[in-house]
Amino acid sequence: MAIKSYKPYTKSRRYMTGLSSDDITAKASVKSLLVKIPASLGRNNNGRITSRHKEAGAKKLYRIIDFKRTKFGIPAKVEAIEYDPNRNCRIALLNYADGEKRYIIQPNELNVGDVISSAESGLDIKPGNAMKIKNIPVGTIIHAIELKPGKGAQLARSAGGYAQLMGREEKYVILRLPSGEMRKVLGECMATIGVVGNEEWANISLGKAGRNRYLGVRPQTRGSAMNPVDHPHGGGEGKTGPGRQPVTPWGQPTKGLKTRHKKASDKLIISRKKGK
């Protein structure tokens, strides 16, 4: 997939880049797999902001993605490759032999006309096939990985993402995640073979603030530009430093302080992220 540039008829477009849509084959989405999801805008049920710098972004419909891959033993033909406004990778429309249609995340090297399947075991190691992790050979590159059997894929779902199966230990398998973290996952969980497609997304330059607004991201104001009542870094005459250790708006030290709470799943993490 090629990166395209734009003529610099404005200053913001000079450094703006995008992805070509040559790989997209569908002219329209399947209506039965589209659903409206109201935007939360970062507010809770009381209307208060609980997650800052969020907005609705461009108007879009949600595509129902099959993250569970539990349709065992029925082959599916890739009917189309589509754009999904809700994620940074492409999605593939599968047409199953029994007539049902489903969307999945498109892995690299999965093209229109390919036939894939999902099963507990016994499938070829090729992009798009899904099996229980305990039945996948050690060393295989996988994505769309479940953390709990039957819950649906939660790991390695974004563009260019993948994990590697490093070994087995009793009822668990050992995975190296995209962050570099090594952790155990139950062997009964499902995973899909291959690397998530559209890996060139990481090289895109948005170029202007407006493209961030389309994605639902609002501007972020520096604490030092606020008043003392609004932020611990606020106030002072002229351009003044924080005068203390940099903190969040609520006084929590930032720039490196670990804030992750202890969880029951800590015992499954063998080593934390790279350089963390």
Curated annotation (Swiss-Prot):
Kindly state which keywords UniProt assigns to this record, in alphabetical order: Ribonucleoprotein, Ribosomal protein, RNA-binding, rRNA-binding
List, in alphabetical order, the GO biological process terms annotated in this UniProt record: cytoplasmic translation
**CC per GO annotation:** large ribosomal subunit
Matching SMART domains: Ribosomal_L2, Ribosomal_L2_C
Query: Where is the stretch described as Disordered?
Result: 219-276
Ranges of compositional bias, category Basic residues:
257-276
- The membrane spanning regions, by residue number, are none
- Enumerate the PANTHER family for this protein: LARGE RIBOSOMAL SUBUNIT PROTEIN UL2M, RIBOSOMAL PROTEIN L2
What is the annotated role of this protein in its UniProt record? One of the primary rRNA binding proteins. Required for association of the 30S and 50S subunits to form the 70S ribosome, for tRNA binding and peptide bond formation. It has been suggested to have peptidyltransferase activity; this is somewhat controversial. Makes several contacts with the 16S rRNA in the 70S ribosome.
- State how it assembles: Part of the 50S ribosomal subunit. Forms a bridge to the 30S subunit in the 70S ribosome.
Q: Which family does it belong to?
A: Belongs to the universal ribosomal protein uL2 family.
UniProt xrefs under HAMAP family: Ribosomal_uL2_B
Q: What is this protein called?
A: Large ribosomal subunit protein uL2
